């Protein structure tokens, strides 16, 4: 029997419902329960796949190829469960599926309404996503009081009626602000938020109160009195430097035990020793390395959320504080590579569109020519190949057909644009990896023996997640290999380039997939760990050169 924990948010958005849900999931998992998490998004887009990163932040790709909310990345980083397309759905998806059923005649000519048809579809999707787990944590996106969230709130209200309070539990996350002018903590916003929730039939069982500092006992008692929540169930969650402290903070306040008590679950004590080790390693670094992330969405750091977390994870596993310098690739186009001179390593992440591309190419060239560790992910690998083709293979104006459809040397292109020497356009059968459509999800990669990639992974075959349309052009790759480009990873059928490196460079690696999606704080990821180690080595080498005595003779 699956128990359901519904997490809602009030007062303001961006309080950290995703992190709180994931942290509670980590606690319950440490208590011996199998856990899954779902995110319900109230926007009408079917999924975030076509949304601007500035609007939505990162699109997280699941193993089964779904484009989902970035909160699913938090879920996978905190718990051991692997998320699927069933773990995230939107209002748009719900309505699309209901309309499809109506067109098919499933409702036998009935009038389709929000209640019961939309709410029934929401409940069915929640049950489907929760199937097989002891506990399903269901995060409802948006803020209580928003009109967009009402169908989701009505659906979970109905689930409490249908399943009872031994199988369902409501947690409400609110803001308790500190008003500096008055010198007081204000509980009124939380009181009103709970009042709004109760007005639609939901009484929270537990409150998690977000604040700058820990709530004094008097304020917790006041909140309990006016919200009809027992005082032990009013949890204080103050700001912390690292999100990986939160499972420990919530465990120490008894949240996991409180949940198990209310849901009548017999569970063991939560063993969070691995989280303690993560936090201790993050708080006590022995080294510092500066990494430039050269991208086009750098004004919103959530656009690269999994990437920044993967770098932090690598720092945890190398006892290193990783300082991330986000650099707009258009700024490099305007001001040159001077912006890169103070960094120890350069990373160019994925992206779409031509804006800022030449700046990324300049960054790859700067790293290659100056022996600076370079990590190119997805588009970052493709622009490294473009730069190499132009400079080392004398392919003038080489490019991707995404940016220049008329380029004489399409080193990156849709598979349907590849043309063999005989003038025949490459054709793919149904079921093949199609370059003309988005290639999504986990796919196997075979690594070259004696390559850096093979040494980093420690195995000859890996599965990594993809999100791209364009591929490296096999018809031109042979010329690049003659000039020193190493193809260190290929698809299992040998037709698609998955990884590249340079043999004559200290650390220059590109991958077509997104390794950041599978990095976790407890395990890290071999490519990111190798990258940070290379950055540290480059930093030490630079210091040694600067410290060496001058060779010039003086009178």
UniProtKB/Swiss-Prot annotation:
Xref: InterPro entries = Class_I_gatase-like (IPR029062), CTP_synthase (IPR004468), CTP_synthase_N (IPR017456), GATASE (IPR017926), GATase1_CTP_Synthase (IPR033828), P-loop_NTPase (IPR027417)
Q: Where is this region: Amidoligase domain?
A: 1-265
Q: How does it assemble?
A: Homotetramer.
Q: What is the lineage of its organism?
A: Bacteria, Pseudomonadati, Pseudomonadota, Gammaproteobacteria, Legionellales
- Assigned keywords, A-Z: ATP-binding, Glutamine amidotransferase, Ligase, Magnesium, Metal-binding, Nucleotide-binding, Pyrimidine biosynthesis
* Binding residue positions for CTP: 13, 146-148, 186-191, 222
**Reactions performed catalytically:** UTP + L-glutamine + ATP + H2O = CTP + L-glutamate + ADP + phosphate + 2 H(+); L-glutamine + H2O = L-glutamate + NH4(+); UTP + NH4(+) + ATP = CTP + ADP + phosphate + 2 H(+)
How is the enzymatic or functional activity of this protein modulated?
A: Allosterically activated by GTP, when glutamine is the substrate; GTP has no effect on the reaction when ammonia is the substrate. The allosteric effector GTP functions by stabilizing the protein conformation that binds the tetrahedral intermediate(s) formed during glutamine hydrolysis. Inhibited by the product CTP, via allosteric rather than competitive inhibition.
Protein's gene: pyrG
Annotated Mg(2+) binding lies at 71, 139
Q: What task does this protein carry out?
A: Catalyzes the ATP-dependent amination of UTP to CTP with either L-glutamine or ammonia as the source of nitrogen. Regulates intracellular CTP levels through interactions with the four ribonucleotide triphosphates.
Q: Where does L-glutamine bind?
A: 351, 379-382, 402, 469
| Annotated residues for binding of ATP | 14-19, 71
Report the pathway entry.
Pyrimidine metabolism; CTP biosynthesis via de novo pathway; CTP from UDP: step 2/2
Name of the protein described by the UniProt record: CTP synthase
Q: What else is known?
A: CTPSs have evolved a hybrid strategy for distinguishing between UTP and CTP. The overlapping regions of the product feedback inhibitory and substrate sites recognize a common feature in both compounds, the triphosphate moiety. To differentiate isosteric substrate and product pyrimidine rings, an additional pocket far from the expected kinase/ligase catalytic site, specifically recognizes the cytosine and ribose portions of the product inhibitor.
Q: Which CDD domains does the record cross-reference, listed alphabetically?
A: CTPS_N, GATase1_CTP_Synthase
**Which leading EC class covers this enzyme?**
ligase
Is Ligase one of the keywords? Answer: yes
* BP GO terms, sorted: 'de novo' CTP biosynthetic process; pyrimidine nucleobase biosynthetic process
